[in-house]
Amino acid sequence: MSTMSESFATAGSLIVAADPNLLHIVALSLQVSLTAVFLAACLGLPIGAAVAVGRFPGRKPLTVILNGMMGLPPVVIGLLVYLLLSRAGPLGSFGLLFTPTAMVIAQVVLITPIIAALSRQIVADAWRDYEEQLRSLGASTPRAALTLLVDTRFSLSTAVLAGLGRAVAEVGAVMIVGGNIDGVTRVMTTSIALETSKGDLPLALALGFILISIVLILNALAHVVREWAVRRHG
């Protein structure tokens, strides 16, 4: 019991003292995840809007695929990206494996379907309400999709925040493609796994506290934005 209490006390001390190693790991985690979410949003939001508004052959199967890809196994994504970036892979000449860039790529592949599927549902709901008005104004499909993306931007922010929460908490894919290299590709989730296996509980607990806090803040922010959007736009 004393060992457990000492571990919690030391973890708190690391956070309060702003341990440099701790801060570096947290900063790298946020850098990788925020970059991945930005790129995934640039891809996922237009895809979701296009599927919601467009009428083309294969639209329903594509919707099913998008929804299904929300549950992609992270380790499988990590393995596929590893094969692409390895020396024997098609992108091996770029030397991206075991770098933060490889981790960003893995997270983009993982969270783009999440953002696309959630945004498709949000835009589809708005499309049912405004389709007649937009058609009467002569809006083309791309124009209608863009208009609805702008109109539902606050609701869409919850989809982006959901993607960010998924990215920050990811461990399997980033460990495979990043290699968990100290000072280079070691992020919060991979550090927690490593330090726990080594028996360094204080650092693992400190990172765990920070990770849980980030996830809770993101979920609370998503809830606040969603409620505010409902009150403002109905």
Q: What spans do the regions from the language model cover?
A:
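C-terminal transmembrane helix and the adjacent membrane-cytosol boundary/short C-terminal tail
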Residues: 114-131, 135-138, 142-147, 205-234
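Transmembrane alpha-helices
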Residues: 118-119, 123, 141-173
